[in-house]
From Swiss-Prot:
InterPro entries registered for this protein in UniProt: Aldolase_TIM (IPR013785), Elp3/MiaA/NifB-like_rSAM (IPR006638), Methyltransferase_A (IPR040072), RlmN_N (IPR048641), RNA_MTrfase_RlmN (IPR027492), rRNA_lsu_MTrfase_RlmN/Cfr (IPR004383), rSAM (IPR007197)
Official protein name in the record: Probable dual-specificity RNA methyltransferase RlmN
Primary residence: cytoplasm
NCBIfam families per record: rRNA_mod_RlmN (TIGR00048)
Disulfide-linked positions: 104-332
Superkingdom of this protein's organism: Bacteria
Gene name in the database record: rlmN
Misc. comment: Reaction proceeds by a ping-pong mechanism involving intermediate methylation of a conserved cysteine residue.
Lineage: Bacteria, Bacillati, Bacillota, Clostridia, Lachnospirales
GO terms under cellular component: cytoplasm
Top-level EC class: transferase
Length: 350
């Protein structure tokens, strides 16, 4: 079965021609899928019943099923848990800002990177998400809320560079003027630092924002937090980041989760300053989300601001990430893990 929502426009034209259909039919279907956000072929009312039946028999129409929604009473953040067609689950977050709505999506079911501060790695990677499954997280949220999504962050469960080909196809579809037409500059992709794939991404010269999950200013400390550091050194990561900036002209963002007593010292701040000085970059400080299965604790507010001030005084562009959805299991993987626990406790019932 063809995953029809993962086809770009030209591929869909070819596919429809194989069914004996003219090009304009492909345009109609593409509009239903990516602009009108139809839930199924049945909603494509300007396609004949015979064509809709033919499509049902030859292709799969991905439409994620929301099984749990949490609403933050603190800031209006909404967290969605979606069931996939194979029974797996992924989660997404809608964050509301004055400049528009931003959706954080997952790129994989689970994750194999093993970062110690992240809940999505607790049970490892199950599988990659297809372009359609990444897109439909955004489509479902926009359709459920009736509010336009203006920004997309690929920073949920999974490592996007570990699902590279599907990620690039997803960006192409999301950016297509025939669909949601979300500007590349409004798309942020996070990575823990798979260097060869980051180089490939740089060579594409896309105008997306790249966010590197750094979290430590030296290899020794980073290895205790992120297993990927055993494969790629910070020096290699910084080199590919400079290459990315050179190729794209885009500023790099470095994510730095502050963990109490681990990476929040003034010495760490000094090392971080030396690491990024002179780069066209931005540091995003993140008070780590406490996870019951991990022993990491959040740095105190006073220490967070001391760390920030140290960077600012040395000319580093830095912000503290606003904590969103703190009362609704807002960190990556927490809602999925809790839901799976609930299913286990109820012996498989929903």
């Amino acid at each position: 079965m063809t995953d029809i929502k993962s086809l770009n426009y030209d591929e869909l034209v070819t596919y429809m021609a194989g069914l004996g259909e003219k090009k304009f039919r492909a345009g109609q279907l593409y509009q239903w899928m990516h602009e009108k956000l139809a839930d199924s072929f049945d909603e494509c009312t300007n396609l004949s019943n015979a064509l809709r039946q033919k499509l049902k028999e030859t292709s799969e129409y991905v439409c994620l099923e929301p099984v749990r929604v949490q609403h933050s009473k603190l800031d209006g953040t909404e967290k969605y848990l979606f069931r996939l067609s194979d029974g797996n689950y992924v989660e997404s977050v809608l964050m509301k800002y004055h400049h528009g709505n931003s959706v954080c999506i997952s790129s994989q079911v689970g994750c194999r990177m093993g970062c110690r501060f992240c809940a999505s790695t607790l049970n490892g990677k199950v599988r990659d998400l297809r372009p359609s499954e990444m897109l439909d997280q955004i489509y479902r949220i926009q359709k459920i809320t009736g509010e336009r999504v203006s920004n997309v962050v690929v920073m949920g469960s999974g490592e996007p560079m570990d699902n590279y080909d599907n990620l690039i196809k997803f960006i192409e579809l999301l950016n297509d003027e025939r669909g949601l037409n979300i500007s590349q500059r409004n798309i942020t992709v996070s990575s823990c630092g798979i260097v060869p794939k980051l180089k490939e991404l740089a060579d594409l010269k896309l105008q997306i924002t790249l966010a590197i999950s750094l979290h430590a200013p030296n290899d020794e400390l980073r290895k205790t937090m992120m297993p990927i550091a055993n494969k790629y050194s910070i020096e290699e990561i910084m080199d590919v980041c400079r290459y990315y900036i050179e190729c794209t002209g885009r500023r790099i963002s470095f994510e730095y989760s502050l963990v109490k007593g681990v990476n929040d010292s003034m010495e760490c701040a000094k090392q971080l300053i030396e690491l990024v000085k002179g780069m066209n970059c931005h540091i995003n400080l993140i008070p780590v989300n406490p996870i019951k299965e991990r022993d990491y604790k959040q740095t105190g507010k006073e220490e967070v601001y001391a760390f920030k001030n140290k960077l600012e005084k040395n000319g580093i562009n830095v912000t503290i990430r606003r904590e969103m959805g703190r009362d609704i299991d807002g960190a990556c993987g927490q809602l999925r893990n809790k839901y799976m626990e609930d299913i286990d406790e109820s012996d498989g019932g929903y």
